[in-house]
């Protein structure tokens, strides 16, 4: 943010001259109410104890020192010492060439330089197609990866393939039961069972490829069904994610943890740290020492590993790969698992290096009516179906339209409407509207001036200045979205910028004004279009030129 950087620079110089240290809790940000100016700061109050002065007296000192700054038009003091800054029009006008010169790099920063982050997301069991809930986690994870890379982090995106354990056995059994039923055998459905139509399809494919399977034992047949089902479903998942423009750099197999002896290596490490012990033939994690209400089993007395054991070994492997920060994106139903996993990471000597983001449920609606879903019962809307119906852009934007730990209502009919009530259309149409103005200008023989020749001083009305001020916030919004692991703030920002553009468009006849004003407005609109496109790119959403 250019305005914030300017204030940090000039205030930093004043503090240095006075022998004061920059206060840790000093905040510079746009005020909630625009009547207080362009930026506000609490720095005078944060300096009071250090400077041994009344906050208002400090504010008055700063106000006096800034008198004559060519970019700061006015400094007001409010209440006990809040500082409110109003910048000159020329300051905002100078932002436009910066936006257009940087182009696709406008808003990019290096705050994450030399920090290696792994983001693990989706990681759905390969037991069925991806559903709408997985789609929300996929959009969130992919958007976070884009934002982190945009702000300078070294990022790796990973999918954890749960290809070991009980759910895979249930998948194999489900396919085997359906296969036998299709051949006239009187087999009852087991209690734990996947019932979707895709199971019948997989059963038919297994039979076609293994005509002798009906003569095999249950164990042999289930093993074949399990492996075939897992491989086919995983290929389908990869295909769906590719169509959704979601990237994973690594597909990590849970099975590999056992075959590579990584689980036992982690157990040995925990024992060496005094965080695991044997009792009653089982291996336990001493999680009570780290705040858990009870110790947790890692290996049962019968030798079977718990899910928790694999998860600890998996995270141990992540840190051994050199990641400074590990981000896990989980469904909200895993919230109770977080303290246990945080304790395990701490036991491995990596306290504070795990961030968990929870993704709440999606309520899928059609014309205001909720669509009932159940994965086990086979009644669910697949991600593929939703994307095919409403499009990738609409799906991604809707998934990112609210904070991830908030429930999301996704109305399939609403996002197909070409109206301003549709949030996806509202933002994309702002970009398309600018492109339409550019085409009309060309049709009328109006040329867009070169950046350095544009008469930007003609941009002085409130709507024009508001667009410039909002564009200035983009880099800060992107940085905060990455630092706080909150991709949804990008969609909030884009709606604000789109709203300002639509307001400007409705209040001013862009191509019916003084020649200099028209020229300056066209360059301004180019900068707004670039900022919108950069923001939409972070969401993985296109910026159409017409709609």
Curated annotation (Swiss-Prot):
GO cellular component, one term: cytoplasm
Catalytic activity line of the entry: tRNA(Arg) + L-arginine + ATP = L-arginyl-tRNA(Arg) + AMP + diphosphate
Entry keyword set: Aminoacyl-tRNA synthetase, ATP-binding, Cytoplasm, Ligase, Nucleotide-binding, Protein biosynthesis
Annotated compartments: Cytoplasm
Subcellular location, principal: cytoplasm
PANTHER family: ARGININE--TRNA LIGASE, CYTOPLASMIC, ARGINYL-TRNA SYNTHETASE
Protein name as catalogued: Arginine--tRNA ligase
Gene name, Swiss-Prot/TrEMBL: argS
């Amino acid at each position: 943010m250019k305005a914030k950087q300017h204030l940090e620079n000039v205030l930093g110089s004043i503090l240095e001259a006075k022998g004061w240290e920059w206060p840790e809790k000093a905040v510079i940000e746009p005020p909630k109410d625009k009547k207080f100016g362009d930026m506000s700061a609490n720095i005078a109050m944060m300096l009071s104890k250090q400077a041994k002065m009344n906050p208002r007296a400090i504010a008055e000192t700063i106000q006096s020192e800034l008198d004559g700054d060519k970019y700061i038009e006015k400094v007001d003091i409010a209440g006990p010492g809040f500082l409110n800054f109003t910048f000159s029009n020329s300051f905002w006008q100078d932002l436009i060439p910066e936006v257009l010169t940087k182009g696709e790099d406008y808003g990019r920063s290096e705050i994450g330089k030399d920090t290696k982050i792994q983001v693990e997301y989706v990681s759905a069991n390969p037991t069925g197609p991806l559903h709408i809930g997985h789609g929300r986690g996929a959009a969130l994870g992919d958007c976070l990866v884009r934002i982190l890379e945009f702000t300078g982090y070294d990022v790796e995106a990973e999918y954890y393939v749960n290809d070991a354990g009980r759910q895979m056995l249930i998948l194999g059994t489900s396919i085997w039961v359906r296969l036998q039923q299709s051949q006239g055998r009187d087999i009852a459905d087991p209690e734990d069972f996947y019932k979707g139509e895709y199971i019948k399809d997989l059963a038919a494919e297994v039979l076609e490829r293994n005509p002798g399977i009906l003569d095999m034992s249950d164990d042999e047949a289930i093993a074949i069904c399990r492996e075939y089902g897992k491989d086919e479903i995983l290929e389908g998942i990869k295909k769906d994610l590719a169509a959704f423009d979601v990237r994973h750099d690594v597909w990590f197999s849970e099975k590999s943890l056992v075959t590579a002896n990584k689980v036992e290596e982690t157990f040995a490490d925990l024992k060496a740290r005094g965080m695991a012990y044997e009792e009653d033939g089982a291996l336990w994690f001493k999680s009570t020492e780290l705040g858990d209400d009870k110790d947790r089993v890692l290996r049962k007395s019968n030798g079977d590993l718990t899910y928790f054991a694999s998860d600890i070994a998996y995270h141990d492997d992540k840190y051994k790969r050199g990641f400074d920060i590990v981000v896990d994106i989980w469904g909200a139903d895993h919230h109770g698992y977080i303290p246990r996993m945080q304790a395990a990471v701490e036991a491995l000597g990596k306290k504070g290096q795990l961030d968990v983001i929870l993704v709440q449920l999606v309520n899928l609606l059609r014309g205001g009516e909720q669509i009932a879903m159940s994965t086990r019962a086979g009644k669910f809307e697949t991600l593929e179906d939703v994307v095919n119906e409403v499009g990738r852009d609409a799906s991604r934007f809707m998934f990112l339209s609210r904070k991830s730990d908030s429930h999301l209502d996704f109305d399939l009919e609403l996002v197909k409407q070409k109206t301003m009530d549709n949030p996806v259309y509202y933002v994309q149409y702002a970009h398309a509207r600018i492109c339409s103005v550019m085409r009309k200008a060309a049709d009328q023989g109006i040329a867009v001036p070169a950046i350095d020749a544009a008469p930007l001083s003609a941009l002085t009305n409130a709507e024009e200045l508001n667009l410039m001020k909002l564009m200035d916030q983009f880099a800060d919004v992107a940085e905060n979205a990455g630092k706080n692991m909150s991709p949804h703030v990008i969609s909030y920002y884009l709606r604000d910028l789109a709203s300002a553009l639509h307001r400007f468009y409705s209040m001013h006849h862009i191509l019916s004004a003084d020649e200099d004003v028209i020229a300056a407005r066209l360059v301004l609109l180019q900068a707004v279009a670039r900022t919108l496109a950069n923001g939409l790119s972070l969401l993985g959403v296109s910026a159409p030129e017409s709609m």
